[in-house]
Amino acid sequence: MTSEKTIPAKPDKTSTILVPVFIPAVLVIVLMVIGTMSNPDAAGKLFAEILTYMTNTFGWFYMLAVAIFLVFVVAVAFSSWGNIKLGPDHAEPEYSFVAWFAMLFSAGYGIALLFFGVAEPVLHYSAPPEGPALTIDAAKQAMQIAFFHWGFHIWAIYCLVGLSLAYFAFRHGLPLSMRSTLYPIIGEKIHGPMGHTVDVFAILGTMFGIATTLGLSVAQINAGLNYLWPSVPVNTTVQIIAIVAITALATLSVVAGLDKGVKRLSMLNMVLAIGLMLFVFAVGPTIFILNTFMENTGSYLSNIVERTFSLQAYTSSDWIGNWTLFIFGWTISWAPFVGLFIAKISRGRTIRQFVVGVMVVPTIFTFLWFSVFGDTALHLIMVDGYTALIDEVQADHAIALFKLLEHLPLTSIVSFITVILIITFFVTSSDSGSLVIDSLASGGVTHTPVWQRVFWASTEGVVAAALLLAGGLGALQTATILSALPFAIIMLIAAVGMWRALIIEGHQEVSLTQQMQSSPGGHKSGPGLWKKRLANLVDFPPRDAVEKFIRTTGFQSMHRVEQELEEQG
């Protein structure tokens, strides 16, 4: 499945840009930014119309695609293919499980848990998609929906992309780029216009997905600063300033690279996030949290199939578009970024280890997070009677977490730490995204010049600022759902491609095993077999056969070793 074209060239000192990918991607981004900033009001109105159209027309496709992704990765993991390594059979993981999970956690969730951990359960409780609001059933439904939105489904999206990339790159020597996932379908055409187009869509999806994250981040940072220092206003100007300042921090991290910058920030994120969760668990309604965690998990698992295919087809509500489709679309648009990033850090793990690690561990952590923060908020409303929290969250989603912390001990200190955590998540998302986009725009090259990484980190900030000016969260929602559509199609094709590749590898393994078992040199006994074994041992190939093997196999393998050693420094 490999070819001489597939090995990424060693990056030169000035540029590793792949022009047919870089230029179209930058052109689309520049046109979008110019069009948005030249007339923000008109752009905002257009985004709203597009969002309505996409929701009504393609909602069914998004839901079906995500269901297929989930079934596919689970089926592959628990099949006989689950023992296949993402790399040579002798490869070992490069990172410890803790460091690996920390980077998974920071890249895959980032600001989402902090932004929606309190806000989403409260909003669903006060305005559920089904049934009356402000009831016990509404509270149960709110937590079930939150679990569904951030559970197995979104990690299946990341898992499919990451698994496909890691398999084709590390197992078969193809570039660590989205185009490689289509090799079993289109073959060598991945090196031409079709492959370039796939990577362009991957860049655009990643760019708008990260821009959405940055937009949500600065909104929550602004709310936190206003909460701590009321003289700081909540407006777009402050949020743009925050984007500029924190993009500068992200640039410093991205210059440091994966092992130094991203890994250290990811570990810091995980420590701060777990510390914050344990604090709220300890000082909040601990027993209530434990009870609701068990009940919510059971409710989620028992209703997962119905939720997966629910589109509210018999109602005229826009709830599904504003919530489920937005979150799934946001996740799909993030998939090239998160998938490529987790593929980079997962070399040497088996397919089963990869799928279980990517899907199960983060999902359990998510359920714990929403139970701690979401159920603490619901307890505050339903038991303690602080119903004003509903109005505060509805007025400004970004302030939800800080309003919850207001009713816990050490409010100012914990709120300040929360702002720091949001900033570090912001920086991690930006610098990880910059590394991934830069690799995609370079045809899969992993070691690129500093100026390219700086360029993409800066571009992410500009796009986020432009979308904020054009209508805030609504514009961000539209950009993510729109960019997710073509990439969802690419992901379905990639799943078919990987399935075909695994079937071929399985057939080769069976064939090799049968040959070894039937070989005259096998462990069989009987009259005359020793003569066959001896003849096999002294049956040396002719000189021309040896020279052909060296030319076609030996030189190519040594060239790959040379490239790998050069990239590793």
Roles of regions detected by a PLM:
Residues 7-14, 39-54, 73-94, 142-149, ...:
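Membrane-water interface regions at transmembrane-helix termini and the short interhelical loops
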Residues 202-349, 356, 361-416:
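Membrane-embedded translocation segments of transport machinery
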Residues 28, 61-77, 273-284, 365-375, ...:
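Hydrophobic alpha-helical segments of multi-pass membrane transport proteins
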Residues 12-23, 27-37, 70-75, 109-113, ...:
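Helix-loop-helix module between adjacent transmembrane segments
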Residues 4-13, 45-51, 78-97, 122-145, ...:
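Flexible loop linkers connecting adjacent transmembrane helices
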Residues 2-13, 175-193, 217-241, 273-276, ...:
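Helix-loop-helix connectors at the membrane interface of multi-pass transporters/channels
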